[in-house]
C-alpha cells in the first residue's frame, strides 16, 4: 500500500522535471534559439587564452586517456617497429569552458580545437604518425556543462618496437606505446588511464597474420629527465608469433631437401653424374632458402633459432655430398692408386735385382736366378723330374736363390734331392707370396653407403628432437 502511494508521489514530482528537460532540449534545437547557443559559444571563446593551461598557478591538470584500437596493421622485424591505428581520446576539465543554461553537451567543429588549450601529448617511441584527414580532419571537440573537455583523434602511428630475435620464429615480443607530455612537468599536468584496466578497448578484435596477442598491460609512472619529472603512460602488447607460416615456408622444405639428399646413398656408387647432380642441387636449394630468409630479417649480430635449423640442414646436405666424394675416392682413387704404386714398386725391385744379379757370378760358379726362373724350376721339380745331378737350388740368409753346378754321385744326389724337395717347396711358396700385390677390398664403398643410410637419418632425427625441445619449451 505504502509502496503504491510512494510510486504515485515520485511520478507526480518527477513529471515536471522531465517536461523541463524536454522543453530545454527542444528549445536548444529550435532554430529560433540557436542564437542562444551561438552566444554561449562566443562567450566561452571570448577572452580565452590558449597559452595558459587550466588552473594556471594551481594544482596540475589531470588528463585521462582512453584508446580504442582499430587495427594493428603491420609488425616489421626488418625495421623493428609496428603500425597501429587507434581512436585516441583525452579528457580534462577546464573551468573557463563551463557553461549554464544549456543542459546538453556541445560537440563543436574540429577547427575549434585550434582555439582551445590541449595537452602537449606525444608518443615517445613514435617514428611516424598522422591524423587522418578524409573527408575532414578526424578530430573531435566536445564540451560538457561542467567544463570537461573531450578531445578525440583518429591516429595512425608507426612506433618502434625493439625485438629480441634469438628465438625467431618461436619467439614472443613485447611492443609498447609510450605516451608522455612533451613540455609540462608533473607540477603542471598528470596523466592517468581513464577507466583503469578498461581504458583500452578493441584488443580482442585484432587479428594479425603472424602474431597472436597474448595480453596487454597498462602502466602509469613518472620519468625524470634533466629538465624535470614528466608523466608517462605505457600500453604494452605481448605478441606470440604463429609458427604455421614458417613450418610451411621454411621448415618443411628444409626437411624435405635434407631427406632428398639421402637418396644418393641408394644410387650406385659408379653413377657419378646422378649423385653429384643430386648433391649440388640440394646444396644450392638450401643456399637459396637461407638467402631468402636473410632478406626478410634485419642484419643482427647474433644467431637466430631458424638460422640454427637451416645451418643444421645445410650441414647434413653438404655432408651427404662429401660422403659421395669419399666413396668416389675410395673406389676410383685410393684403390687403383695403391695398386699402381705397389705394382711399380715391385717392378722396380725386380728390375733392380735382375740388373744386379746379372752382373754377379761368384768364384764357385753360382748363377743368380730370378723369381720366375725359380718358379719354373720348381714346376719342373714338382713335375717329377728327379734328376738333380746337374743342378741344385739353395738359399742364403739374404733370400737370394742360387743354382749350383755340381756332379754328385747318382745315388747320393737322388737321395739328397728327394729329401730336400718338401723344404724347397715350402720355402718357395713363402717367398713367392711376398711378391703378390695386395689389391684393396673395393667392396667397402657399399658398406659406407649402408652405414650412411642409418647414421644420417638417425642424427638428423636427434638434431630435430633437441632443437624443438629446446626452443619450444
UniProtKB/Swiss-Prot annotation:
Segment forming the signal sequence: 1-25
Residues at which benzamidine binds: 120-122, 180-182, 225
Residues binding histamine, per UniProt = 122, 181-182, 227
How this chain sits in the membrane, per its record, is:
Multi-pass membrane protein
Task: Say which domain of life the source belongs to.
Answer: Eukaryota
Biological process (GO), any one: roof of mouth development
Query: Which PROSITE patterns does the record match to this protein?
Result: NEUROTR_ION_CHANNEL (PS00236)
Q: Keyword Nucleotide-binding on this protein? A: no
Q: Where does 4-aminobutanoate bind?
A: 122, 180, 182, 227
Q: Which InterPro entries match?
A: GABAA/Glycine_rcpt, GABAAb_rcpt, Neur_chan_lig-bd, Neur_chan_lig-bd_sf, Neur_channel, Neuro-gated_channel_TM_sf, Neuro_actylchol_rec, Neurotrans-gated_channel_TM
| Disulfide feature | 161-175
Instruction: Give compartment(s).
Output: Postsynaptic cell membrane; Cell membrane; Cytoplasmic vesicle membrane
Q: Which reaction does it catalyse?
A: chloride(in) = chloride(out)
Q: How is its activity regulated?
A: Potentiated by histamine.
According to the record, the segments passing through the membrane are 247-267, 272-292, 305-328, 448-470
One Pfam annotation reads: Neur_chan_LBD
Task: Name the reported effect of residue 232 to Q.
Answer: Found in patients with Dravet syndrome; uncertain significance
> What is this protein's function?
Beta subunit of the heteropentameric ligand-gated chloride channel gated by gamma-aminobutyric acid (GABA), a major inhibitory neurotransmitter in the brain. GABA-gated chloride channels, also named GABA(A) receptors (GABAAR), consist of five subunits arranged around a central pore and contain GABA active binding site(s) located at the alpha and beta subunit interface(s). GABAARs containing beta-3/GABRB3 subunit are found at both synaptic and extrasynaptic sites.
Q: State the family named in the UniProt similarity comment for this chain.
A: Belongs to the ligand-gated ion channel (TC 1.A.9) family. Gamma-aminobutyric acid receptor (TC 1.A.9.5) subfamily. GABRB3 sub-subfamily.
| The name this protein goes by in its record | Gamma-aminobutyric acid receptor subunit beta-3
Amino acid at each position: 500500500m505504502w509502496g503504491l502511494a510512494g510510486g504515485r508521489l515520485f511520478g507526480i514530482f518527477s513529471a515536471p522535471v522531465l517536461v523541463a528537460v524536454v522543453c530545454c532540449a527542444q528549445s536548444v534545437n529550435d532554430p529560433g534559439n540557436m542564437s542562444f547557443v551561438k552566444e554561449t559559444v562566443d562567450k566561452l571563446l571570448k577572452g580565452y587564452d590558449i597559452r595558459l593551461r587550466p588552473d594556471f598557478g594551481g594544482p596540475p591538470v589531470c588528463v585521462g586517456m582512453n584508446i580504442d584500437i582499430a587495427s594493428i596493421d603491420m609488425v616489421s622485424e626488418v625495421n623493428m617497429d609496428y603500425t597501429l591505428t587507434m581512436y585516441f581520446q583525452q579528457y580534462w576539465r577546464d573551468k573557463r569552458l563551463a557553461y549554464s543554461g544549456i543542459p546538453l553537451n556541445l560537440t563543436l567543429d574540429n577547427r575549434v580545437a585550434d582555439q582551445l588549450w590541449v595537452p602537449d601529448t606525444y608518443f615517445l617511441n613514435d617514428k611516424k604518425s598522422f591524423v587522418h584527414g578524409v573527408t575532414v580532419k578526424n578530430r573531435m571537440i566536445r564540451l560538457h556543462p561542467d567544463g570537461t573537455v573531450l578531445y578525440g583523434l583518429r591516429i595512425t602511428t608507426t612506433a618502434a618496437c625493439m625485438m629480441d630475435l634469438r628465438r625467431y620464429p618461436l619467439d614472443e615480443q613485447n611492443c609498447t606505446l609510450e605516451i608522455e607530455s612533451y613540455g609540462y612537468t608533473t607540477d603542471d599536468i598528470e596523466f592517468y588511464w581513464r577507466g583503469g584496466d578498461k581504458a583500452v578497448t578493441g584488443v580482442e578484435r585484432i587479428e594479425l597474420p603472424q602474431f597472436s596477442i597474448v595480453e596487454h598491460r597498462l602502466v602509469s609512472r613518472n620519468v625524470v629527465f634533466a629538465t624535470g619529472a614528466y608523466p608517462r603512460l605505457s600500453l604494452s602488447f605481448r605478441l606470440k608469433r604463429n609458427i604455421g607460416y614458417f613450418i610451411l615456408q621454411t621448415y618443411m622444405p628444409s626437411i624435405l631437401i635434407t631427406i632428398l639428399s639421402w637418396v644418393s646413398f641408394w644410387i650406385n656408387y659408379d653413377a657419378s653424374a646422378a649423385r653429384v647432380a643430386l648433391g649440388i642441387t640440394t646444396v644450392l636449394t638450401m643456399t637459396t632458402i637461407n638467402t631468402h630468409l636473410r632478406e626478410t630479417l634485419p642484419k643482427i649480430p647474433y644467431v637466430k633459432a631458424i638460422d640454427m635449423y637451416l645451418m643444421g640442414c645445410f650441414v647434413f646436405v653438404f655432408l651427404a655430398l662429401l660422403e659421395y666424394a669419399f666413396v668416389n675416392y675410395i673406389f676410383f682413387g685410393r684403390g687403383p692408386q695403391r695398386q699402381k704404386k705397389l705394382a711399380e714398386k715391385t717392378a722396380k725391385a725386380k728390375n733392380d735385382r735382375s740388373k744386379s744379379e746379372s752382373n754377379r757370378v761368384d768364384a764357385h760358379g753360382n748363377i743368380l736366378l730370378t723369381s720366375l726362373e725359380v718358379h719354373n724350376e720348381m714346376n719342373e721339380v714338382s713335375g717329377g723330374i728327379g734328376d738333380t745331378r746337374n743342378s741344385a737350388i739353395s738359399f742364403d740368409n739374404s733370400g737370394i736363390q742360387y743354382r749350383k753346378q755340381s756332379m754328385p754321385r747318382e745315388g747320393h744326389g737322388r737321395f739328397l734331392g728327394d729329401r730336400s724337395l718338401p723344404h724347397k717347396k715350402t720355402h718357395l711358396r713363402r717367398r713367392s707370396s711376398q711378391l703378390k700385390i695386395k689389391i684393396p677390398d673395393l667392396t667397402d664403398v657399399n658398406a659406407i653407403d649402408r652405414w650412411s643410410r642409418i647414421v644420417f637419418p638417425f642424427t638428423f632425427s636427434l638434431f630435430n628432437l633437441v632443437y624443438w625441445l629446446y626452443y619450444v619449451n
